[in-house]
């Protein structure tokens, strides 16, 4: 594409916008709060009016935290509901491609630079084999890159964050039992997301006979990492361990010998604590398949906008991003 393209990463809490040229570099990136706008069209118009420098893009590539099934988009953890066609027309785009947000993250992993990846154990990746991608944010995103015989890659659009969460210890079983009194289905996302950390904290508090005095993941994380609140500390530790369980299950399901990449808005902000946590031990703790998983490398993506890196692939080389 010779002209600038509008790219967007639309999650449950924030929508990130930028302009992108054929070199794949994001220009004028801006983060807007979804709650401040009635939908993507008003947010896009605000971005273009205030931050685009007079550029009127004709094409768009959006990553959205939603199932992509036809024209209608309903974000999983946001009140935004919109039509792709109507949005395209409302903001004056001639072309608009929309993919799942973690599909875009999956498309990014082969293009990330070493400085945007933090190793969290394991061996070396095996070339040409499946790659797993997951990460907690407002929800729990899950995707994968699957290679073809011709050397091209397909990014899977999945709803793997809604698989049933399994306990690996008696304490986790009690925590999940407690959460089942609140939710008909305790999915992985119910514990591995921003609200999921709050859910874990509340369950741990109840089981420990303490009052749950905190209500935001940021405060729980801070109090857990600095050790000032034992309940918060246990909630964060359980969060890391359950991430290992889910990531290990995903690696086994995919045969992800190409590696496991972890993204999302939560873990990069506590990267060192995550690296030193029980995540990797739990990732490998799958009985007879411990040696199999021990060889699979895991990385934390520290790039601030990995979805934009993936969208750049769609913009510059849509056939084999």
UniProtKB/Swiss-Prot annotation:
ATP binds at residues 8-13. Keywords: ATP-binding, Cytoplasm, Glycolysis, Kinase, Nucleotide-binding, Transferase. GO terms for biological process: glycolytic process. Its EC number is 2.7.1.2. One of its GO terms (cellular component) is cytosol. It is found in: Cytoplasm. GO terms for molecular function: ATP binding; D-glucose binding; glucokinase activity. The keyword Cytoplasm applies. InterPro entries: ATPase_NBD, Bacterial_glucokinase, Glucokinase. It catalyses: D-glucose + ATP = D-glucose 6-phosphate + ADP + H(+). It is an enzyme of class 2 (transferase). The keyword Kinase applies. PANTHER family: GLUCOKINASE. Belongs to the bacterial glucokinase family. NCBIfam families: glk (TIGR00749), PRK12408.1 (NF009073). This is Glucokinase. It comes from Paramagnetospirillum magneticum (strain ATCC 700264 / AMB-1) (Magnetospirillum magneticum).
């Amino acid at each position: 594409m010779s002209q600038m393209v509008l790219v967007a990463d639309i999650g449950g809490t924030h929508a990130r916008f930028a302009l992108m040229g054929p070199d794949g570099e994001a220009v004028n990136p801006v983060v807007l709060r979804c709650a401040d706008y009635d939908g993507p069209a008003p947010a896009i118009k605000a971005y273009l009016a205030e931050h685009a420098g007079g550029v009127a893009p004709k094409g768009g590539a959006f990553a959205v935290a939603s199932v992509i099934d036809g024209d209608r988009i309903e974000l999983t953890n946001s009140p935004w509901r919109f039509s792709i066609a109507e949005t395209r027309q409302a903001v004056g785009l001639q072309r608009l491609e929309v993919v799942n947000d973690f599909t875009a993250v999956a498309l990014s992993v082969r293009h990330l630079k070493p400085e945007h990846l933090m190793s969290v154990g394991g061996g070396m990746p095996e070339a040409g084999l499946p790659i797993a991608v997951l990460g907690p944010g407002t929800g729990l995103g899950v995707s994968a890159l699957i290679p073809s015989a011709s050397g091209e890659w397909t990014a899977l659009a999945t709803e793997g964050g809604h698989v049933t969460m399994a306990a690996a210890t008696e304490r986790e079983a009690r925590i999940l039992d407690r959460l089942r009194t609140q939710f008909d289905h305790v999915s992985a996302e119910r514990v591995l997301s921003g609200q999921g950390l709050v859910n874990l904290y509340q369950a741990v508090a109840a089981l420990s006979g303490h009052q749950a005095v905190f209500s935001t993941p940021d405060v729980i994380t801070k109090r857990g990492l600095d050790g000032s609140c034992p309940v918060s500390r246990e909630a964060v530790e359980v969060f890391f361990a359950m991430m290992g369980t889910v990531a290990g299950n995903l690696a086994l399901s995919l045969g992800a010998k190409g590696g496991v990449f972890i993204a999302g808005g939560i873990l990069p902000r506590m990267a060192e604590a995550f690296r030193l946590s029980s995540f990797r031990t739990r990732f490998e703790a799958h009985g007879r398949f411990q040696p199999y998983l021990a060889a699979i490398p895991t990385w934390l993506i520290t790039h601030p906008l990995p979805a934009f890196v993936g969208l750049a692939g769609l913009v510059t080389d849509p056939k084999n991003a």
